């Protein structure tokens, strides 16, 4: 898929392993991996950070192959899922940082333009998550309350 506000074609992608079974050298069971996921979530880590730690420290390449569920679904079952999806959270965080920058540097026209692009991505992603019912239908992005969402 191509990039949204960029001329790049977006061709490169990570290579997924062909075999969909659990590696024979992995010693962790499904219950142990789920326990690790909940333990890391209690520390305040986001799902992508949990996946990186499991990959680097414990050798779990893909949690879904071991447990049968994705990290977010495991967290949802335990009632620990983030209220805002992670990609939307990071876009809101970026918009808040750009706004903070613009308060100090009012003449920075390029940052003002980039803020418009980031906020259009936020609105598009929010519309997608509303149709998928991962966000309530009444949820709305407002720049005045955005800093409270990411703090």
Swiss-Prot record:
Entries under Gene3D superfamilies matching the protein: 4.10.860.130, S15/NS1, RNA-binding (1.10.287.10)
Swiss-Prot/TrEMBL GO biological process terms: translation
SMART domains attached to this UniProt entry: Ribosomal_S13_N, Ribosomal_S15
Cystines in this chain: none
Classification via InterPro entries: Ribosomal_uS15, Ribosomal_uS15_arc_euk, Ribosomal_uS15_N, uS15_NS1_RNA-bd_sf
GO cellular component: cytosolic small ribosomal subunit; nucleolus
Pfam family for this entry, one: Ribosomal_S15
Alphabetized PANTHER family for the sequence: RIBOSOMAL PROTEIN S15P/S13E (PTHR11885), SMALL RIBOSOMAL SUBUNIT PROTEIN US15 (PTHR11885:SF6)
Descriptive protein name: Small ribosomal subunit protein uS15
């Amino acid at each position: 898929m191509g990039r949204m506000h960029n001329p790049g074609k977006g061709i490169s992608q990570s290579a997924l392993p062909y075999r969909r079974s659990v590696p024979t050298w992995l010693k962790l069971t499904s219950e142990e991996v789920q326990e690790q996921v909940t333990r890391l979530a209690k520390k305040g880590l986001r799902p992508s950070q949990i996946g990186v730690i499991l990959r680097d420290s414990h050798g779990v390449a893909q949690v879904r192959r071991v447990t049968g569920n994705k990290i977010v679904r495991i967290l949802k079952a335990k009632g620990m899922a983030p209220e805002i999806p992670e990609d939307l959270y990071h876009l809101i965080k970026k918009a808040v940082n750009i706004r903070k920058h613009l308060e100090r540097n009012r003449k920075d026209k390029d940052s003002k333009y980039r803020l418009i692009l980031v906020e259009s991505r936020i609105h598009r992603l929010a519309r997608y998550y509303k149709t998928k019912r991962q966000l309530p239908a009444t949820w709305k992005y407002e720049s005045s309350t955005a800093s409270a969402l990411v703090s």
